[in-house]
Amino acid sequence: MNHFPWLTIIVLFPISAGLVIPFLPSTGNKIIRWYTLGVCLLEFLLITYIFCYHYQFNDHLIQLKEDYNWISFINFHWRLGIDGFSIGLILLTGFITTLATLAAWPVTRNPRLFYFLMLAMYSGQIGLFASQDILLFFFMWELELLPVYLLLAMWGGKRRLYAATKFILYTAAGSLFILIGGLIMAFYNSNEFTFDFQFLINKKYPLELEIIIYLSFLIAYAVKLPIIPFHTWLPDTHGEAHYSTCMLLAGILLKMGAYGLIRINMELLPHAHSFFAPWLVIVGAIQIVYAALTSLSQRNLKRRIAYSSVSHMGFVLIGIGSITNLGLNGAILQMISHGLIGASLFFLAGISYDRTRTLVLDQMGGIGNSMPKIFTLFTSCSMASLALPGMSGFIAELMIFLGVIDNPNYSSLFKIIIIIIQGIGIILTPIYLLSMLRQMFYGYKFSNTLEPYFMDAGPREIFILICLFFPIISIGIYPNFVLSIWNSKVNFLLSNNFF
């Protein structure tokens, strides 16, 4: 166990600092905003310090391990650790949450609760990615639900209560299957039950039981990822949530399901994963095309972007199901890439709504002339979303594309069919994104006035978008550094469990 509890500090610091917010002076919102931003920035700097000085790139084992007996009666341990799968997502969480806090600057109604909930989400997300115990993983998974529900129900749009209720019902029901699967794994064929990932890796199950456990976890991840047909909560949630909340949902929350699929299903249940892998590839390919077609029919800007997220997460499913070095590396890169691109698109949709007061694409035409900066940034981020060469999405999707081809266990016919379906999805993506840009910026005038005028992006908004767009370009031009973060872990997982 590591002597200094770095991981415990970064998990508990945000929510602990959030408890101070009720005692801050009540003269306006300025102090609360700056305090929360300072906490998020300090947390991100701590994460960056741990990554730079304590994380070993070539070590595939769990690093900075911490193990404290929390509730001995049920053998509940506070087990934390990081490896290649988790550190990239922890960095993404710190980066996106800090920018989402800055994006929430205009929020003036009940700011104490709003910013506390954001910090509580921060702790839950870091805790989930650092968990090395199924019960702690479940605890952190559940910790996300209440903050998101309240952020949606209190600061959402007109149909916020419907969207919040749908979100909590879907995700809470799905969460139960994590607990069920975890309990079966802990108690099966063991005198002393444990939820420790490192112990459960070496545990063997009959294939039928392993498939049941795998399905139990998969149902929970299917809601969060999301996988069709469990995706219907996502467009409603994104359509009603404040755009800072949307940044956290698209940037981090969806990645929790994909992370669980790799961390638990792929690592702890490899035989069942080999059985289900072709089906994951098939569902992922169908999801890409289905969500792209559905996105094209959406008249609401945020719902269109939400369906594009569902489509892009289909690539992650294919990469995980490919069981190849290229495919799995590409899937993790796609998670990072989509986190940045999705957050930027929802932020742009939000600041566009702040100016036009509408999300209906048919009513947003002709605003490009009065908002050239937003137009330029929106176009650039849309190009990143459609995987333009030189941007992060292109590298990720190309690796996933090649990963399916690289799997020797899939027949040539299967590969050809999947490649054709992926190709259709890749063709549909620019259609719905470019039509969105045309309707917003090139379409008919917003009103009957000669030239509607809206204020363009300010310094704060431009700063947020540059911060998001810079890593998208950097990864697209030179992905080797980012891929090296988790490549050794990917190699170890595949060679140890599948080859």
Swiss-Prot record:
GO cellular component, one term: chloroplast thylakoid membrane
Keywords: Chloroplast, Membrane, NAD, NADP, Plastid, Plastoquinone, Quinone, Thylakoid, Translocase, Transmembrane, Transmembrane helix
Enzyme Commission code: 7.1.1.-
Membrane-crossing segments per the record: 4-24, 31-51, 87-107, 113-133, 134-154, 167-187, 211-231, 242-262, 274-294, 310-330, 331-351, 385-405, 416-436, 462-482
Cell location: Plastid, Chloroplast thylakoid membrane
Reaction(s) this enzyme catalyzes, per UniProt: a plastoquinone + NADH + (n+1) H(+)(in) = a plastoquinol + NAD(+) + n H(+)(out); a plastoquinone + NADPH + (n+1) H(+)(in) = a plastoquinol + NADP(+) + n H(+)(out)
UniProt keyword Lipid biosynthesis present: no
Location (main, coarse): plastid
GO terms, molecular function: NADH dehydrogenase (ubiquinone) activity; quinone binding
HAMAP family: NDH1_NuoM (MF_00491)
Protein name: NAD(P)H-quinone oxidoreductase chain 4, chloroplastic
Native organism: Marchantia polymorpha (Common liverwort)
Higher taxonomy: Eukaryota, Viridiplantae, Streptophyta, Embryophyta, Marchantiophyta
Gene: ndhD
